[in-house]
Design a protein with these regions (language model features):
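A conserved catalytic-core segment of Leloir-type glycosyltransferases
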Residues: 24, 30-114
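Conserved acidic donor-binding segment of nucleotide-sugar-dependent glycosyltransferases
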Residues: 351-360, 368-373
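Conserved donor-binding/catalytic core segment of Leloir-type glycosyltransferases
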Residues: 229-246, 252-255
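Aromatic "clamp/platform" in nucleotide-sugar-dependent glycosyltransferases that forms part
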Residues: 318
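A short helix/loop element that forms part of the nucleotide-sugar donor recognition site in Leloir-type
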Residues: 212-229
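Short hydrophobic beta-strand element within catalytic cores of glycosyltransferases
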Residues: 335-338
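Carbohydrate-associated surface elements
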Residues: 183, 205
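Short alpha-helical donor nucleotide-sugar binding micro-motif in glycosyltransferases
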Residues: 297-298, 305-310
Length: 426
């Protein structure tokens, strides 16, 4: 399995999804070598799979200590050599150079290995070249797992043509493609010209053991928010990377409209990203900076506590292939509001939906929930029944079935190819 990050050295949901997915696969009998482009300790992952390093480079972090997953979430991520990175010299210059280096190391590893993998599973565009070269070196079938396309990361714009090309060739070379939602599958078929029959929708899920409730509000990092809730305020939260793809400027504009009708609202935005300063300035320009809190990147207990204190969770993404945080929010009895371009809406139906650009409708929904305890309760109870049906075990069993089909088909085609060679020689 080829991936670009794993917790605790992750900067977003890709690493979380890969970790939980691999854990469930291991519980269903898969033996996994997970190869990363950096060298670091992963004690939790080591408990159920073999985590390998393709290079001796450490994980990259910015000046605030946040991890940088070069290009995993944005075509404009900081590159090696960026002034924001403490360990820039550990990587070759340029994002494509980093992916080439990773691919070189993967090819060397599989050629020098004592065993041949039964299947190669590559996560997103950064590992696709490595997946192709590993397939060529070993003859093993390749599965490409698309968590997001460049069209998603560009937030409705065309994005980086080089990344489009890498994604296209990776999906062409794949024996099977996993897409995290029907929305993503439709993009793969429509924008990349891939046959629909080659793409399997595999929704993400959640692991409740990773989302245990905190035991006491006295230890929380959010005393202020708890105090404001006792005064009748509602907490509206968005947790994501602060990038154009996530549509947070629309949420802040909707917040202005909502606050004009119900001043007892506090908006909390958790996450880090290149749009942070722009969003802070937008809140100030709109005169609501006293009602919008930016927490920075959150993980662990602070991450869980933020969900717990929230009344509403909003995902205003312009293009969201899945949206794992919405499932997590549902676990914490939070009313969920989703843009219509969020893939998690294929799993969660007891939610409020809106077009990402329709700030007036989003404001209406926020105000409606904030003023109606009955509506909030109905949404929370309805969504609870849906997330209780979600589990990584079912996802893993579906993937194991697909693995078996791909391996069997690969063997059949290899046998046919050998027979043809014999016939041609004769």
């Amino acid at each position: 399995m080829l991936g670009w990050e794993l917790p605790p050295h992750n900067s977003g949901g890709l690493g979380v999804a890969c970790f939980q997915m691999a854990k469930a696969l291991a519980q269903n009998g898969a033996e996994i070598d997970f190869v990363l482009p950096y060298k670091a300790s992963h004690p939790e992952a080591d408990a159920f799979m073999n985590v390998l390093s393709a290079t001796d480079a450490p994980p990259m972090v910015d000046d605030q200590g946040n991890y940088i997953a070069m290009g995993a979430y944005s075509g404009n991520c900081p590159l090696c050599g960026s002034r924001h990175c403490k360990h820039a010299r550990a990587y070759t210059k340029g994002l494509t150079a980093a992916t080439h280096r990773y691919a070189d190391q993967i090819e060397s590893m599989v050629r020098g290995g004592t065993t041949t993998p039964k299947i190669i599973h590559a996560h997103d565009w950064l590992t696709m070249e490595a997946g192709i070269r590993a397939k060529e070196a070993t003859g093993a079938p390749l599965i490409v797992h698309v968590h997001a396309t460049e069209f998603d990361r560009a937030g409705g714009h065309s994005g980086n043509p080089l990344i489009h090309d890498i994604e296209y060739f990776g999906m062409q070379a794949a024996d099977r493609i996993f897409a995290v939602s029907q929305i993503t599958k439709d993009i793969i078929v429509r924008r990349y010209g891939i046959p629909a029959g080659k793409v399997e929708v595999v929704h993400n899920s959640i692991d409740p053991s990773e989302l245990s409730h905190t035991t006491s509000q006295t230890d929380t990092s959010y005393h202020y928010l708890h105090q404001m809730k006792t005064r009748g305020y509602k907490i509206v939260t968005g947790i994501c990377r602060l990038t154009v793809q996530k549509g947070l400027s629309y949420l802040i504009e909707a917040a202005t409209l909502a606050l004009s009708r119900n001043p007892k609202l506090i908006f909390v935005i958790g996450g880090s990203g290149e749009q942070r300063n722009q969003l802070v300035e937008l809140a100030a320009d709109l005169g609501i900076s006293d009602r919008v809190i930016f927490t920075g990147f959150v993980r662990g207990a602070r991450f869980r506590e933020l969900y717990e204190v929230s009344d509403m969770f909003v995902m205003p993404s312009i293009s969201e292939p899945f949206g794992l945080t919405a499932l997590e929010a549902a676990y914490y009895d939070t009313a969920v509001l989703l843009s219509k371009t969020s893939g998690v809406g294929e799993v969660l139906h007891n939610v409020m939906r809106f077009d990402y650009w329709d700030t007036r409708k989003l404001a209406d929904q926020i105000v409606g929930i904030s003023l109606s305890p009955a509506l909030q309760s109905t949404l929370v109870e309805g969504i609870k029944q849906e997330y209780l049906r979600c589990n990584w075990g079912d996802v893993a069993r579906k993937m194991m079935h697909q693995y078996s089909r791909v391996i069997a088909n690969h063997r059949r085609l290899s046998k046919v190819s050998r027979v043809k060679e014999v016939v041609n020689r004769g």
